């Protein structure tokens, strides 16, 4: 699937047949996000304020030596689609839908067709503001998340050992008055940790298939991610802020891949 049109067609087929598609967003599963969800549910976190996201990875000549990589035909996109789609899914999982996007994309690291650097500014539907910094020209692979709520600051460790599974990294959860650190720590001590990464994802799919309460990724979640990608390319192409949602009349609804 490489367009909103295609995923809407899939949703229509699922609705008609009763079949279920389980998209793959394995970053959602692990102790870091289990703890954050518990704090949000406890209402200790408070109002979402801002967040910063970093996808700073190292992809050079060896990675792009395969002819299909770095091309619109082979990958349907660059770092926005192939490398940072998961971290953007995470922020929508935490903060909810995006309201507007402004994006600047550039190819600064490799001699390829698609982008390998980006700076993105988001306004969320709840009013929170988010920045996302992306490059494939870093010395090592690091995925880092920092989120500020009115009563809580959360930061993932950004370890180069966990770039593809940030939920398994070491996280900080710091209280801000009037909430105390003891209150935060008490919630954290009672969190039942889930399985991480693919194991966690497939466990939730299994629960769904067994008719149990589950937290699987839905096709609507996947559509939200593709709408994000579409808006990023639209913003970069036009050099302006793009409001969500993306309507069917948008020129990129059928495909964000540039026409030759």
Put a short name on every predicted segment.
Residues 10, 36, 231-232:
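Aromatic/hydrophobic pocket-lining residues that form π-stacking "cages" and hydrophobic walls in ligand
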Residues 1-28, 43:
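Beta-strand-loop-alpha-helix segment that lines the small-molecule cofactor/substrate pocket
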Residues 27-111, 239:
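Predominantly a Rossmann-like dinucleotide-binding segment in NAD(P)-dependent oxidoreductases
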Residues 19, 46-50, 234-260:
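C-terminal capping/lid region of NAD(P)-dependent oxidoreductase domains
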Residues 120-127, 147-149:
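Active-site beta-strand termini and strand-to-loop segments that position acidic
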Residues 146-220, 242, 248-260:
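C-terminal glycine/acidic-rich active-site capping loop/insertion
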Residues 95, 202-213, 230-237:
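Short, hydrophobic alpha-helical segments
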Residues 85, 133-141:
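Glycine-rich phosphate/pyrophosphate-binding beta-alpha loops
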């Amino acid at each position: 699937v490489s367009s909103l049109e295609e995923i809407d067609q899939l949703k229509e087929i699922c609705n008609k047949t009763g079949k279920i598609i389980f998209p793959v967003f394995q970053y959602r599963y692990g102790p870091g996000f289990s703890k954050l969800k518990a704090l949000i549910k406890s209402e200790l976190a408070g109002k979402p304020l801002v967040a910063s996201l970093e996808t700073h990875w190292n992809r050079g000549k060896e990675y792009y030596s395969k002819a299909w990589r770095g091309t619109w035909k082979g990958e349907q996109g660059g770092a926005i689609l192939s490398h940072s789609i998961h971290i953007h899914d995470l922020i929508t999982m935490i903060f909810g839908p995006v309201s507007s996007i402004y994006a600047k994309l550039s190819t600064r690291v490799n001699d390829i067709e698609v982008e390998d650097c980006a700076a993105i500014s988001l306004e969320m539907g709840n009013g929170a503001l988010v920045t996302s910094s992306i490059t494939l020209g870093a010395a090592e692979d690091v995925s880092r998340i920092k989120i500020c709520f009115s009563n809580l600051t959360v930061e993932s460790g950004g370890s180069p050992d966990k770039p593809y599974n940030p939920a398994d990294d070491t996280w900080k959860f710091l209280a801000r008055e009037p909430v105390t650190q003891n209150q935060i720590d008490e919630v954290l001590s009672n969190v039942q940790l889930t399985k991480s990464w693919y194991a966690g994802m497939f466990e939730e799919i299994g629960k769904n298939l067994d008719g149990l309460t589950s937290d699987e990724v839905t096709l609507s979640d996947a559509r939200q991610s593709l709408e994000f990608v579409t808006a990023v390319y639209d913003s970069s192409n036009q050099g302006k802020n793009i409001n969500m949602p993306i309507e069917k009349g948008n020129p990129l609804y059928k495909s964000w891949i540039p026409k030759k």
